[in-house]
Amino acid sequence: MARSGLDRIDISPQPAKKIARVGGLQHPFVKTDINTINVEHHFIDTLQKTSPNMDCRGMTAGIFIRLSHMYKILTTLESPNDVTYTTPGSTNALFFKTSTQPQEPRPEELASKLTQDDIKRILLTIESETRGQGDNAIWTLLRRNLITASTLKWSVSGPVIPPQWFYHHNTTDTYGDAAAMAFGKTNEPAARAIVEALFIDPADIRTPDHLTPEATTKFFNFDMLNTKSPSLLVGTPRIGTYECGLLIDVRTGLIGASLDVLVCDRDPLTGTLNPHPAETDISFFEIKCRAKYLFDPDDKNNPLGRTYTTLINRPTMANLRDFLYTIKNPCVSFFGPSANPSTREALITDHVEWKRLGFKGGRALTELDAHHLGLNRTISSRVWVFNDPDIQKGTITTIAWATGDTALQIPVFANPRHANFKQIAVQTYVLSGYFPALKLRPFLVTFIGRVRRPHEVGVPLRVDTQAAAIYEYNWPTIPPHCAVPVIAVLTPIEVDVPRVTQILKDTGNNAITSALRSLRWDNLHPAVEEESVDCANGTTSLLRATEKPLL
């Protein structure tokens, strides 16, 4: 299959034309201002022209609406009259395996032409070409008008999709304040390095790409850090070892997810996700950097600095608990064996040794949350604590606990009521649509870091662990702009995939059906009031077709 050429776009600020040589072919590209592409207008136009009763051959209308929309956006980028173009014909090659298509295909036409395998092939190519996420122009464009894993809201009755979801183009994450989000974005590379160095089983990495006796390739494609990726030629950041692009729900076309770290083999020629025949499961990691623990280790008046020093000198579970409980709202919330957890924190415990004075339980659980609480209650987290860095060597290592182990098991697990758990549940749902036969193993990673001392500023820190040696010359490294790691917590998460799948699939399909009927009515009766239905909770609201969308 020919590569789509969709990520051959340089989005750096200075305008200039270049030639990128990829696979022996020359592909012209120019720099782009993605704001010139009216994504919202076209998506709504596609919805308005789609029949609610179209024949989808056992599939859903939403996926073909999404594909038709993406086709329009991608071919727009090919137009030499626009500010940006990708390789002419690349979109048709991706969708129809031909360089020509007489006209823009409507959803009904795509439904008659594309098989389920075709849909997966197209969407897996999109995922590959959108790695780099926020630094990738295609990722930014195609993410609009999607309900994303990080922005989907949940009520007591389940996931909530707003009645006018198709007008919403601002998919900025809304969890936490601006300072906390900035801290997370800044320190995510540090957490990624820790994940690579400590959390990924080396057995997951050195599996051969071929099982035949004559096979010579003895590593996953991602072991090579995707050094042949076209993205390296056009100014987008270097694609990391386990980076993931935009995964679009193959069931409804409505929901999207971009995983922080995804451990899955890729096709060495196309870069698309392609699990090895020997793989039985796929691990992925959601990273959360906790800004509220940031402290200056030399500030004698800061209680975090004091409990940190105690933990470093005497690494025990009691001292770890004291450090985590130093702040007013710690990242671990105790709720008691007979109580319910609140929605406050992503990590919870009911272990008596972690009881905290003044704790408050939460309201009654929904049936789904209670079910997931039961699935996760017996799961333990693992914790690593880091030594002060060796600046001369440029390395940082983990501390051995009193038990002699580098990781400590603690009775802390994921909170099914928290937004982080919901986000991971949605990610699991989206990924399961591509690989239904494989066991998905999601993890929540909690990163805690401290301010750098003056002599540590500007120094990259190699995470020096035995497992990290498998990366050879691409050793996981804490970038110089990141905080110094103090603690990393790895929490496995158990999601009832079949149950979540049914809920999200039904919610998505209902939202699409409601949108098709609503917008089709608007076209026929532009001045008539109508009821718009929230498919998640059954509520209705009066909208006028003449009202301008809230963009």
UniProtKB/Swiss-Prot annotation:
InterPro entries assigned to the protein according to its UniProt record, in alphabetical order: Herpes_alk_exo, PDDEXK-like_dom_sf, Restrct_endonuc-II-like, Viral_alk_exo
Entry protein name: Alkaline nuclease
Cross-referenced Pfam families: Viral_alk_exo
Main location: host cell
Lineage summary: Viruses, Duplodnaviria, Heunggongvirae, Peploviricota, Herviviricetes
Protein's UniProt keywords contain Nuclease: yes
Keywords: Endonuclease, Exonuclease, Host cytoplasm, Host nucleus, Host-virus interaction, Hydrolase, Nuclease
HAMAP family per record: HSV_AN
Positions of transmembrane segments: none
Subunit text: Interacts with major DNA-binding protein; this interaction increases the nuclease processivity of the alkaline exonuclease.
Family: Belongs to the herpesviridae alkaline nuclease family.
Function: Plays a role in processing non linear or branched viral DNA intermediates in order to promote the production of mature packaged unit-length linear progeny viral DNA molecules. Exhibits endonuclease and exonuclease activities and accepts both double-stranded and single-stranded DNA as substrate. Exonuclease digestion of DNA is in the 5'-> 3' direction and the products are 5'-monophosphate nucleosides. Additionally, forms a recombinase with the major DNA-binding protein, which displays strand exchange activity.
Annotated GO CC locations: host cell cytoplasm; host cell nucleus
